[in-house]
Amino acid sequence: MAKANEHFFYVLKCSDNSYYGGYTTDVMRREAEHNAGIRCKYTKTRRPVKVIHFEKFETRSEATKAEAAFKKLSRKNKDSYLSEREEESK
């Protein structure tokens, strides 16, 4: 169960190898919703999807700003962003 004060930016990898970035308070629940075709037109036709990255933020505003910034990136820059964060987590 998610805590009310947890805010996450997450990235899904879709079955067509595209990325989807979003905001949620519960990453596991939101992944299940995407895979069930609930509340997202983009991923509905690109299932199954898998969470490949998420970041926790103190506020909703910070998390949605991270989401917006990610969505503005080119595919090449999205790949770089995800690779850099993967290296940081090792």
UniProtKB/Swiss-Prot annotation:
<comment type="similarity">
    <text>Belongs to the UPF0213 family.</text>
</comment>
<dbReference type="InterPro" id="IPR050190">
    <property type="entry name" value="UPF0213_domain"/>
</dbReference>
<dbReference type="InterPro" id="IPR035901">
    <property type="entry name" value="GIY-YIG_endonuc_sf"/>
</dbReference>
<feature type="domain" description="GIY-YIG">
    <location>
        <begin position="5"/>
        <end position="80"/>
    </location>
</feature>
<dbReference type="InterPro" id="IPR000305">
    <property type="entry name" value="GIY-YIG_endonuc"/>
</dbReference>
<dbReference type="Pfam" id="PF01541">
    <property type="entry name" value="GIY-YIG"/>
</dbReference>
<protein>
    <recommendedName>
        <fullName>UPF0213 protein lin0209</fullName>
    </recommendedName>
</protein>
